[in-house]
Amino acid sequence: MKRKLFLLLLLFVGQYSVFAQVISGQNGVRDKRPGYYLFKNATIHVDPTTTLDEAWLLIKDDKVEKVGKSFDIPKGTVVVDLKGKHIYPSFIDIYSDYGMPELKRGAGGRGNFYEMKFDSDKPGAYAWNQAVKPEVKASELFTVNAKAADEYRKIGFGAMVSHVKDGIVRGNSVLVALSSEKENKALLKSNVSSHYSFQKGLSTQTYPVSLMGSVALLRQTIYDADWYKKTKASTERNLSLEAFSDNLSLPSIFHGTSFHDALRIDKIGKEFGIKYIIKSGGDDYKRLDEIKALSTHLILPLNFPKALDVEDPIDADGVALADLKHWELAPANPARVAESGINFSFTASDLPLKAAFFTQLQAAIKAGLSKKDALSALTVNPAKVLQIDDQVGVIKSGLLANFLVTDKDIFEEKSKILENWVQGEKFVISDISATEIAGKYTTTIPGFK
C-alpha cells in the first residue's frame, strides 16, 4: 500500500514539475515536439559583411540552430529548398510606439491663455509636472497589435523597441517581437532604453509653453534627481525622481526635429555627462561636421519631403528656396551621414504609410547610400547600440529565428519579400511558389500570319 502511494506521489510530482515549466496558459494539448526547419541552397546574408552562397539554415522552434553548408540534420526536420532565393536577418526599429496605448488628449492646459494650470492631475507620489514621467514602463503597457504587426512584417521588420511617445521625460522602452504570440512570448526584454524630448505632449499643465521652458524643466529634473539620490529621500518620497535615476543606467534616446535640436541635445548631455542617442530630423547634412563632432548614434527617418507643387507660378512664388533644397537633398542625408563615419540606424515610425518604406529606402540608395550601410542600419547597428545583439540583428546560432526570405537582393528594385519568419513563426508575404508570368509574349492565331 505504501509502495503504491509512493509511486502515485512520484507520478504527481513528476507531472507537476513538467507543467511548472510552462508559465502562460494555453487551451488544449501542448505540442512539445521540437520544430526543426532546414532552409537549404539559399544565399544567406548572415550579417552586412558576411554572405554564404548555396548555404543552409537550420532553426529549432524560435531559435537559430546552425548556419553553414551540408551538415547533419535531426530526424523529422522539415526541409525547404530555397535555391535562387535570399535570406536576410529581419529588420529592427528602435524608435517605435508599436503595442503602446493610443494617446488621447484630455481637457485643460491648452488654447485658453487666461486659464493657467500649474498643478498636476496625476495622483500619487510623482513629479509635480505631468510632462515628466520617467516611471512609465513600456513593458507594463505593451499589448500585441495584430494590424500594426502585419504592416511592419510586410516591410521586413521582426523586432521593435517601443516606448510611449508622450512628454519631455518619457520613461523606458521594451523590446518585442512581431510574432502572433501572446505578450508573454512576444516581450523579449524590459527596460531597454530611456526616452526624452522637447515636446510636453498631452500634459494639461500650462508649463512649459516654449522650447526654453522644456529645456529648463529637463535640466531642473536632472538636478532634482541628483539631489534626491544624494539625500536618500530624507524629506519625502518621489517615485518619478527615483525612476529617473534608475533610467540613467540605460541607453538614452532623445527625440529631435532638426539639426538645431541635435546640437542642443548634445549641449545638455555634456552638461550632465550623458551621451544621448539622437532621433534625427533628417536634415543632418546641413551641419554635417558639427553633427559628426558629437560622436553619437543617429536614428534617421525615411519620411523624405514630397515634391512641391510649382506648376502654377503664383504657387511657386510662395515656395521657399530652403524647402526646395531640402526636398532635393533629404534623400541623400543617409549617404552623407554614412560617408562621414557616423553610426546610424533607420526608423519607419515617421512614415504615415508603412508600405512606402522600400520606396523611400530606394530613394536613399539611389542618392548614394550603399546596400551594406542600408542593411547595417536596419540590423546590426540598432541591435548593438541598445545592447540587444544577444537576441537579434544577425543570423547566428542561439539568436532568435527572425529572418526574411526574398526572391533576390532585397535592395534591388522590384524585389519581393516572400516570407518573414519571426520567433520561428512563418508569415507569408508573397506566394513563394507563384510562377512569374511577366515578360514579352507572341500571340499566334490559327489561319493568320
Segment roles from a protein language model:
Residues 1-26:
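Bacterial Sec-dependent N-terminal signal peptides
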Residues 22-24, 29-35, 44, 48-90, ...:
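Histidine-rich, glycine-flanked metal-binding segment
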Residues 25-31, 44-56, 68-69, 355, ...:
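Acidic, glycine-enriched loop/beta-strand segments at the rims
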Residues 37-43, 433-449:
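Tryptophan-anchored aromatic micro-motifs
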